Amino acid sequence: MERSEQRVRAAWDCDPGKQADRDYREDGMDLGSDAGSSSSSRASSQSNSTKVTPCSECKSSSSPGGSLDLVSALEDYEEPFPVYQKKVIDEWAPEEDGEEEEEEDDRGYRDDGCPAREPGDVSARIGSSGSGSRSAATTMPSPMPNGNLHPHDPQDLRHNGNVVVAGRPNASRVPRRPIQKTQPPGSRRGGRNRASGGLCLQPPDGGTRVPEEPPAPPMDWEALEKHLAGLQFREQEVRNQGQARTNSTSAQKNERESIRQKLALGSFFDDGPGIYTSCSKSGKPSLSARLQSGMNLQICFVNDSGSDKDSDADDSKTETSLDTPLSPMSKQSSSYSDRDTTEEESESLDDMDFLTRQKKLQAEAKMALAMAKPMAKMQVEVEKQNRKKSPVADLLPHMPHISECLMKRSLKPTDLRDMTIGQLQVIVNDLHSQIESLNEELVQLLLIRDELHTEQDAMLVDIEDLTRHAESQQKHMAEKMPAK
């Protein structure tokens, strides 16, 4: 702005008419500055740059005669001063704006308390120079958007050259000042910032500074990957161990369950003598593994055949007479005969050696097993004859063949057609009662079979122990005989 004013001053100094007009303007500016001296002062740089010092020619024209010449010169001058000043300032406006912003930023950075400036304030600062003379300076108003310098017509110009704004009698021309923006609380203030539109900020030393966060330490990715791989390997080992434990426990449970099923179905004891000894009370290993000699193998063969014959006899009993239990008299007679034979054998076997005694016992066992099956059949026939008649025979006396068919559990369709509904209902009820009784009898027989199997296992173990003991005694006796 100083450059533009210097250029305007130089142009007017060259023309005497313009210089006279400038003297007239200077008198008016002095009057305007005296009227606005009560307002806030501006920077000393602008006031000093805009001071007007009259030249020698102007001093000579300050006389009364010179004032008349000034009026006549102004009347003869074609172009008024405001129009000329408008042209010059519009030409140098961009340069003035840049210089003014730099000066304001420098001044705001130097001052701690940045005063707010609002549009419409008259800034005048009295410079304290060496001569002590007071000189007031007024800044030029900001250009309007339409390019006009002054917001009012040239008619508002008075004789002293000042612009009087309507509604503001005490105000001078409005200077162009940046508006201070309000800063939100908590924001950090620093040095000057030109991009903020002339915003005055406190220096870094005056405000609170937010501490910067320290940088994160570097990560060792290789060690982290190794650690993760080790954790995954440990988890896999734990899973494998848990799976092996579950598999072992499930295998044990399956074995136990299979043994229980075999015991419940009754087929566990029908597989041979080895299983008899494996489930014996003493808990010794299987008989087939323990027996070494051919004599013991023969005993196993005999026992196996006996078990087969017993099973055949049981099957024949269940097929023929499931509804009739064994007679207690037959059991007692068989037990008495067994006792008599065992007593006689014990008396006769005392005088024999071990081998001959073993052969004789094996022969007797074979004979008993061979006679067991026909004797069982004869016992079943006797029980059938002693069986009670069906109650249906008493209800149907005129149909004896139906009672016989009921005994045989077989009826023809022609017989059923000849019977009434009541007679058929009686037959159905009788069949239900027989089914219940047969089921109860079957349960009792199964319990007896289990007991007999356990007794058989115990006998086989006893026989094995006795055989081993007898063999050891026989060897001991044989060793003593040559020594004598």
Curated annotation (Swiss-Prot):
Residues 1-28, 107-120, 150-159, 306-320 have a biased composition (Basic and acidic residues). Signal peptide: none annotated. Transmembrane segments: none annotated. Residues 239-252, 321-332 have a biased composition (Polar residues). Residues 1-74, 86-220, 232-258, 305-350 are annotated as: Disordered. Pfam families: SCHIP-1_C. GO terms for cellular component: cytoplasm. One of its GO terms (molecular function) is protein homodimerization activity. Residues 421-455 form a coiled coil. InterPro entries: SCHIP_1, SCHIP_1_C. Disruption phenotype: Mice lacking all isoforms encoded by both Schip1 and Iqcj-Schip1 are fertile and survive as long as wild-type mice. However, they exhibit mild growth delay associated with ataxia and reduced pain sensitivity. They display decreased thickness of the piriform cortex and partial agenesis of the anterior comissure which could be due to impaired axon elongation and guidance. The morphology of nodes of Ranvier is affected but nerves do not exhibit significant electrophysiological characteristic differences. Keywords: Coiled coil. One of its GO terms (biological process) is kidney development. Residues 92-106, 341-350 have a biased composition (Acidic residues). Residues 33-67, 123-137 have a biased composition (Low complexity). The keyword Coiled coil applies. Belongs to the SCHIP1 family. Homooligomer (via coiled coil domain). Interacts with NF2; the interaction is direct. Interacts with ANK3. This is Schwannomin-interacting protein 1. It comes from Mus musculus (Mouse).
